[in-house]
Swiss-Prot record:
This is Large ribosomal subunit protein bL36. GO terms for cellular component: ribonucleoprotein complex; ribosome. The keyword Ribosomal protein applies. Keywords: Ribonucleoprotein, Ribosomal protein. GO terms for molecular function: structural constituent of ribosome. The gene is rpmJ. Belongs to the bacterial ribosomal protein bL36 family. GO terms for biological process: translation.
């Protein structure tokens, strides 16, 4: 999982990426390409 300050560029890496909020943290998840998973931090 990649950790980044801003998720804007990580969200644009693939068209299936979506931003979700879990337990106070913001994540980018991708159901089709798992390698695009990321967290803000």
């Amino acid at each position: 999982m990649k950790v980044a300050n801003s998720l804007r560029s990580l969200k644009l890496r693939h068209r299936d990426c979506q931003v979700v909020r879990r337990k106070g943290r913001v994540y980018v998840i991708n159901k089709t390409q798992k390698r695009y998973k990321a967290r803000q931090g």
